[in-house]
Amino acid sequence: MSRKIQRKEQILDAALHVIVQNGYHQSRMDDIVSTSGLSKGAIYWYYKSKKDVYLDLVNHWVIRYSNSLLELPKEDISAGKQLNNLFETFFNQFEKDPIVFKALLEFWSLAGRDTEFNIKLEKVTHNFIQYIESIIKKGVESGEFKQVNPNIAAMSIMVVIEGISWFTLFEKNSVSAKEYIETVFEFILSGLLKRIES
């Protein structure tokens, strides 16, 4: 990893912790400087403003998630298994870095008020829905799934996955994130699978 990439990751990691702690509007570049341990000059070498940092933070996590999804097996595997792997990937990420999901709530809030964040997150969401949609289409075409609207099914799954974020807000929940993921996956899969008539 080059020094430039290391520095940017150090800055973005600090920015992630700052936005979760303070929220976007209460965060300052000085907070990112102190959390990162780098000089102010080093931060401004890469980013001109707080907004630039956080827009790049979205890119950073999109690339990381995209790489994780691309590594999931696609050939010689059923659409149902692909969906299961997708849910497991997001749960594992939640277990590893719940702070990312907490930051996501802040970004969604920003998207409702800021055009640049809105455009950025809309593109991210669109790409992810397309990915899920391709799995649904595969299941429909193979006869594994019912004749459903792939786009609507994909959007529904997207909303369910985003629901993991709410587990970062409350320390005490009547159900665990794992139980939530497993249960809703069963609901979704049972709704998609084509019934075999006896």
In which residue ranges do the predicted regions lie?
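Helix-turn-helix
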Residues: Q10, V18-D52, D56-L57
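Hydrophobic alpha-helical connector segments
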Residues: D56, L70-V100, A153-I157, K178-I181, ...
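Amphipathic alpha-helical packing segments from all-alpha helical-bundle domains
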Residues: E71, K96-I99, T115-E141, N151-M155, ...
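N-terminal intrinsically disordered/low-complexity leader segments
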Residues: M1-Q6, I196-S198
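Short hydrophobic clusters on alpha-helical segments that form packing/core surfaces
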Residues: I11-I19, F90, I188
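Helix-loop "lid/cap" segments that line or gate small-molecule binding pockets
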Residues: L72-P73, E88-E95, L104-G112, F187-L192
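Generic hydrophobic, amphipathic alpha-helix propensity
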Residues: R7-A15, I32, L57, W61, ...
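C-terminal peripheral helix-coil segments that are non-catalytic and often amphipathic
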Residues: N85-N92, I129-K138, V160, E171-S198
